[in-house]
Amino acid sequence: MSDQNEKSPSWVGDIIKLSPKYLLGLAVFSGIGLWLGNVGLGKTLGIKDAINSYKLYLGLVFLASTSFILSHFIWWISLGIKNKIDQKYSYKLQKERLRNLNRREKQILSPYIFDDVRSVELSITDGTAQELEHLKIIYRSSNISNRGSYFAYNIQPWARGYLTKNKHLLHESIDHIL
């Protein structure tokens, strides 16, 4: 097998990997070229004969580039839909988790709502705080510790709003107090 045949698939792969902005340029160029081959302006510009000679190649470039642009667009739309579905599912799980807080989680989240504080210092070794951070209910607002392993954590705006509307979720149950 010759070197030329071994290298041919790589240029095809390179074309497939082109950014949509370059594909759009190819589509516009080849589309205008095809159009100019059929109108008097092409003859006026002196390119009608050249376009007609390469019409097959221009047509292939036009079809391929518009197909790739369309596939990029469909992929972009599908990613957007997937992200929306994932976000909605995640939000549903987060709200469900807030409806089933244990005592330690209520202790961590209560100051944000009842004391109206924006930041609470929590130990980075506190597993409950880390779980709330993993669930994206709170987030570490600073990577610099003030006191050893204690870092400032803020509550996510959506969680603050949800818990402010549902303060009863942070109250201790009467059975536990008795």
UniProtKB/Swiss-Prot annotation:
Locations listed in the record: Cell membrane
Recorded superkingdom: Bacteria
The UniProt record lists the keyword Transmembrane helix: yes
Spans through the membrane: 22-42, 57-77
Chief place where the protein resides: membrane
Entry membrane topology: Multi-pass membrane protein
Keyword GTP-binding found: no
Alphabetized UniProt keyword annotations: Cell membrane, Membrane, Transmembrane, Transmembrane helix
Gene Ontology terms: cellular component: plasma membrane
Protein name (database record): SPbeta prophage-derived uncharacterized protein YopH
Organism of provenance: Bacillus subtilis (strain 168)
